[in-house]
Amino acid sequence: MTVELPSTQRALVFDTWNGPLEVRQVPVPSPADDEILVKIEYSGICHSDLHVWLGDLKDMSVCPLVGGHEGAGSVVQIGKNVTGWQLGDKAGVKLMNFNCLNCEFCKKGHEPLCHHIQNYGFDRSGTFQEYLTIRGVDAAKINKDTNLAAAAPILCAGVTVYKALKESNVAPGQIIVLTGAGGGLGSLAIQYACAMGMRVVAMDHGSKEAHCKGLGAEWFVDAFETPDIVSHITKLTEGGPHGVINFAVARKPMEQAVEYVRKRGTVVFVGLPKDSKVTFDTTPFIFNAITIKGSIVGSRLDVDEAMEFVTRGIVKVPLELVKLEDVPAVYQRMLDGKINSRAVVDFSL
């Protein structure tokens, strides 16, 4: 089986941070001996793509750049040293790749912490293009029965929330608060949390209450209209939730979480406020034996586990399919807080 390939492809490129986003023709790459070439059929649009383009993550990214890091498609070429892949297989291109597989972090399953990591859509051109090479050992295998459009966001958003839920150490039957619950990450987190047996308190703007409860949240807290968030959640959960995951990109909910989480509870930070700084009183942190930790995407195994929920239909990805040319408009809606679903580029449009 051979696949005839074009010499050029469409890609969404920016030359300077916060500069024009332009669809251009760029060369189709050839895979190295240890790589496969994936025809990208769908690419999720992540908030971090927006922040890279805006220049908020200059220390981690380069220009010019093709953004994107949630790509799903089909294998169309295979390097001579690659094993385990066949032409036509469904493959995923996730954010963090090129880890060494030999350091202490890789050996313990903490692959995203490897010092050799390279990030698609950050320091390597990413999935907002029709063809992309990736090492065979890095590409995620996607079940042939999995909806590829739904699979794309799982490669970053899905595994991010799934791993954060695992990091929260909240057990089945216990309560977890999800801030920013009505957004793209939160919408997935509600479903994963419910599937894992957790009881969910969703926190976001009041306009997103029906959306969050429709996904399985047991309670909803209006983050903008509730007079005293800390006392309200403490009372609602009879002593505080066992865990909190902060998806909101603001300082206040991060600081409040330390005050209302249950004794010996865990607060997980995922959302990045613009200035990346928070301030909180160390007294409750110490005297209540609270654990505060960060969480960033997940390992190969985490990706496989997160994808299985989607393949089995347990987690449903709220999708909005858009054209490649629509990415700038999606970024603006993200800035305006008007995204309830996962926007995904459909390259057939």
Swiss-Prot record:
Pfam family, one: ADH_N
Cofactor(s) needed for function: Zn(2+)
Residues reported to bind NAD(+): 180-186, 204, 208, 270-272, 342
One GO process term, biological-process aspect: defense response to Gram-positive bacterium
GO MF assignments: alcohol dehydrogenase (NAD+) activity; zinc ion binding
Keywords noted in UniProt: Metal-binding, NAD, Oxidoreductase, Zinc
EC numbers for this chain: 1.1.1.1
Free-text cofactor note: Binds 2 Zn(2+) ions per subunit.
Binding site for Zn(2+) 2: 100, 103, 106, 114
A cellular component term, taken from the record's GO annotations: cytoplasm
Record-linked InterPro entries: ADH-like_C (IPR013149), ADH-like_N (IPR013154), ADH_Zn_CS (IPR002328), GroES-like_sf (IPR011032), NAD(P)-bd_dom_sf (IPR036291), PKS_ER (IPR020843)
Chain positions recorded as Zn(2+) 1 binding sites: 46, 69, 156
Reactions this protein catalyses: a primary alcohol + NAD(+) = an aldehyde + NADH + H(+); a secondary alcohol + NAD(+) = a ketone + NADH + H(+)
Top-level taxon of origin: Eukaryota
PROSITE patterns: ADH_ZINC
UniProt xrefs under SMART domains: PKS_ER
Coiled-coil portions: none
SUPFAM superfamilies: GroES-like, NAD(P)-binding Rossmann-fold domains
Assembly, per entry: Homotetramer.
Family the entry assigns: Belongs to the zinc-containing alcohol dehydrogenase family.
Protein name per UniProt: Alcohol dehydrogenase 1
Gene name as annotated: adh-1
